[in-house]
Amino acid sequence: MRIGILSDTHSLLRPEVLPLLAGSDHILHLGDVGDPEILGKLAAIAPVTAIRGNIDTHGPCAKLPETEIVTLAGPYPEVAFYLLHDVHQLDLDPTAAGFSAVLYGHSHKPEIRHHKGVLYFNPGSCGPRRFQLPITCGQIVIDKNGQIEAKILTLPIQQ
């Protein structure tokens, strides 16, 4: 299973991200959507699960949940992802809760790390550039044994 992951679009869905998400079985947006039409465009590619970020507290995106649990099963052992916008607001023990991964955004800084057997993954931002950070999104591939491989995908953008 292939999962496309993005965050911090801030009302800008760059056309360069769409080919990177093509072929995804599911897409996760980790908050700061901005324009809800972005979710519709993503849904044309694959089913979408989205959460609200700190810029989504008013308007149509305010209806998005603050956190979400996504459980996926297939020809592999079940995997469970915990989605939240800001990892500093994590108020549970992901290992004790049985999560395979904690997926988050907010900082615009891509990150892949493991702690106590749990993947912590921030795809970075594929919206407006912040400081000198790269423009990125992410991908998770789950193999037939339930192993999770996370990748940061850099968009081909110079400016």
Locate the predicted segments by residue.
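Helix-adjacent hinge/juxtasegments
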Residues: 49-89, 96-98
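Binuclear metal-dependent phosphoesterase catalytic core
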Residues: 69-77, 97, 114, 121-159
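N-terminal active-site segment of His-dependent metallophosphoesterases
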Residues: 1-48, 56-65, 71, 133-136, ...
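Non-DNA-binding regulatory cores of transcription-related proteins
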Residues: 87, 91-97, 102-111, 115
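A structural micro-motif
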Residues: 1, 25, 46, 79, ...
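Active-site neighborhood of phospho(di)ester-bond hydrolases with catalytic His/Asp-centered motifs
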Residues: 5-7, 26-32, 49-54, 82-85, ...
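Short gly/pro/ser/thr-enriched loop/turn and capping motifs at secondary-structure boundaries
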Residues: 57-58, 110-112, 129
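Short active-site segment of divalent metal-dependent hydrolases/proteases
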Residues: 11, 35, 88, 109, ...
